[in-house]
């Protein structure tokens, strides 16, 4: 994908197989024993000269600085990102690591002692996601929701688990109907900072 920035993320220890599309075939790098097992069961080993293929792999280290901690109050989040955002949740629906959900209780009206507690997939980009009793919404402004997703992917998760949540696949950018490229936005912040 032209929007892939996986080279910017700390993925060296966190994959089974990495695929690079080379038009009529794929280059595959094995990253774990599970990945090796998957290949030995499904494919025959071949010996190829990959020098030309390796030159074709697009450089994917596109994010200039993952430390966005000092950018939270930057007013450009609104003008460059959230003003264009439709809150459609395409970014979070297609993200392989987003896991936001809501809990709902369904009570059986014929027997009030029975019911189900359900976890439904949701999105932090939806205004209703942070709505609580009393109709209070914690992230009412679209800018707050927009920033929250990016900070959760690159900052908050890393602070807690010491690894970025984002894998850099670029699906959120590729499928955004208004073509919001948060990597480009962060890089512009970085360029401004250097001036």
Where are these regions (language model features)?
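Iron-sulfur-associated redox domains of electron-transfer enzymes in respiratory
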Residues: 1-74
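N-terminal start-of-chain detector that recognizes signal peptides
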Residues: 1-3, 94-96, 137-139
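Secreted/luminal cysteine- and crosslink-motif detector
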Residues: 5-7, 86, 96, 125, ...
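Small-side-chain structural scaffolding
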Residues: 35, 81-82, 90
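Ferredoxin-type iron-sulfur electron-transfer modules in oxidoreductases and energy-metabolism complexes
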Residues: 65-83, 101-175, 179-195
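A short, glycine-centered helix-capping/turn motif at helix boundaries
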Residues: 88-89, 169
């Amino acid at each position: 994908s032209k929007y892939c920035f996986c080279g910017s993320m700390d993925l060296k220890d966190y994959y089974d197989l990495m695929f690079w599309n080379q038009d009529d075939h794929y280059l595959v790098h094995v990253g774990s024993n599970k990945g090796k097992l998957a290949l030995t069961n499904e494919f025959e080993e071949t010996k190829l000269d990959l020098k030309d293929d390796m030159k074709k792999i697009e450089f994917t280290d596109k994010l200039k600085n993952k430390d966005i901690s000092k950018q939270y109050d930057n007013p450009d989040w609104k003008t460059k990102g959230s003003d264009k955002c439709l809150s459609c949740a395409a970014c979070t629906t297609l993200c392989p690591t987003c896991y936001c959900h809501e809990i709902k209780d369904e009570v059986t009206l014929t027997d009030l002692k029975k019911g189900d507690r359900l976890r439904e997939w949701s999105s932090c980009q939806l205004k209703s996601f942070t709505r609580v009793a009393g109709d209070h919404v914690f992230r009412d402004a679209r800018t707050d929701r927009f920033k929250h997703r990016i900070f959760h992917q690159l900052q908050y998760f890393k602070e807690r688990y010491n690894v970025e949540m984002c894998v850099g696949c670029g699906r959120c950018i590729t499928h955004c109907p208004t073509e919001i490229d948060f990597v480009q936005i962060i890089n512009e912040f970085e360029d401004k900072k250097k001036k």
